[in-house]
Design a protein with these regions (language model features):
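Walker A (P-loop) phosphate-binding loop of ABC-type ATPase nucleotide-binding domains
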Residues: 35-39
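Conserved ABC ATPase "signature" region
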Residues: 96, 100, 107-125
C-alpha cells in the first residue's frame, strides 16, 4: 500500500499555501510537523480529496485519487480541525448517521460504535447532545467518526487539540496499535503527539516539505547544538534575553537548570545533551513558543 503525493501545489489568489510537495507514504504513523500557517491543513484537505490542487496529484497504489472517487473515500478516514454536526445530534445519533453515510452495514454499526465509544471514553456521554460537550469530548467524537469505516488511510489534523494529558496518552497508544498495515498521517504542531509513535516525520515550512526521516535521522542535524547547564536564579532574566532557552527547572539553593539551543556553548559549565524532536522543531521554527502553540 502506498500513497504518493507528486508535485502538489495550491495557490490562493496571490498566496501559495502548498508549493510543489513530493512525499510517498507507506504503512505506519507519519508525523507532519510545522508551525501554524505552514500549509499543513491545506495539504491534508487535498490528500482527503476535498480540495482541488492547483497543480500535481495524489496517487493511491498508482491510481489518481480523483479518478478513484468513492473507492478511495471508502478506504479513507479524516479528522479535520473542525467538523460539522447538527446541534440536536447526540453522540450516538451522529455516529450512526456518519456510519450510514459511509455505507457501513447496519449489523456492524452498533458494535463498531460501542467499541470506539469505549476506547475514546465516550460511553457515558453517548446520549448527550454534541453541542453540550466540552471541546475535548467533541474532539474525541470527531476521532471516532474518522475511524468508523476502519480506514486503510487515516489523516488527522490536530487530533489532540483540547484533550487532557491522560486522553492524549490513550489516543497515542490507540493510534500506534491501529497503524499496523495502515497509513496514519497526523498533522500537528504539538511535537509530543507524535515523537514516540511516529514511524517517520515530514517537516513542513512555508508550504514546502523541507525534511523527511525517522526521529533519529532528523535530530542528527542538531547534535551538539542542545545544551544543559545550571545557573543562579538571579541570572535567568539575562540568559532569557540572549539565549534560546527551551526548558527550565528550579533546583535547590536558588539554582535553575536550563536547556538551550546554540551552535556553541554560551555558558561556562554547559554540556551537550541528546537532542529530541522537540528541539529540532524549535531549531527550525525559532519564533515558536511551545506553550502558546500547545494552547
Amino acid at each position: 500500500m502506498e500513497l504518493k503525493i507528486e508535485h502538489l501545489s495550491k495557490q490562493f489568489k496571490d498566496k501559495t499555501a502548498v508549493n510543489d510537495v513530493n512525499l510517498t507514504l507507506i504503512p505506519g504513523v507519519w508525523g507532519l510537523l510545522g508551525a501554524n500557517g505552514a500549509g499543513k491543513t491545506t495539504l491534508m484537505r487535498m490528500i482527503a480529496d476535498i480540495m482541488t490542487p492547483t497543480n500535481g496529484a495524489v496517487y493511491y497504489d498508482g491510481k489518481d485519487i480523483r479518478e478513484l472517487g468513492e473507492v478511495y473515500r471508502s478506504k479513507f478516514g479524516f479528522l479535520p480541525q473542525d467538523f460539522g454536526y447538527h446541534r440536536d445530534f447526540t453522540v450516538k445519533d451522529y455516529l450512526e448517521y456518519m456510519a450510514a453515510l459511509k455505507d457501513i452495514p447496519t449489523r456492524a454499526t452498533t458494535p463498531k460504535i460501542n467499541h470506539l465509544l469505549d476506547i475514546l471514553s465516550l460511553s457515558d456521554v453517548k446520549k448527550k447532545k454534541i453541542s453540550n460537550l466540552s471541546g475535548g469530548m467533541k474532539r474525541r467524537v470527531g476521532i471516532a467518526q474518522a475511524m468508523l469505516n476502519d480506514p486503510e488511510i487515516l489523516v488527522m489534523d490536530e487530533p489532540t487539540a483540547g484533550l487532557d494529558p491522560g486522553e492524549r496518552v490513550r489516543l497515542r497508544n490507540f493510534i500506534s496499535e491501529f497503524s499496523h498495515d495502515r497509513i496514519v498521517l497526523i498533522s500537528t504542531h504539538i511535537v509530543s503527539d507524535i515523537e514516540y509513535i511516529s514511524t517517520r516525520n515530514a517537516i513542513m515550512k512555508a508550504g514546502e516539505i523541507v525534511d523527511v526521516g525517522t526521529t533519529a535521522e532528523l535530530v542528527k542535524q542538531i547534535e551538539g547544538k542542545v545544551w544543559n547547564c545550571t545557573i543562579p536564579a538571579s541570572k535567568l532574566p539575562e540568559c532569557e534575553m540572549r539565549l534560546r532557552i527551551i526548558n527550565q527547572r528550579g533546583e535547590d539553593y536558588n539554582q535553575v537548570s536550563i536547556r538551550y539551543l546554540s551552535e556553541h556553548s554560551e555558558i561556562d559549565g554547559s554540556v551537550t545533551t541528546e537532542p529530541r524532536l522537540e528541539d529540532l522543531y524549535l531549531w527550525l521554527f525559532p519564533q515558536t513558543d511551545l506553550e502558546k502553540e500547545d494552547r
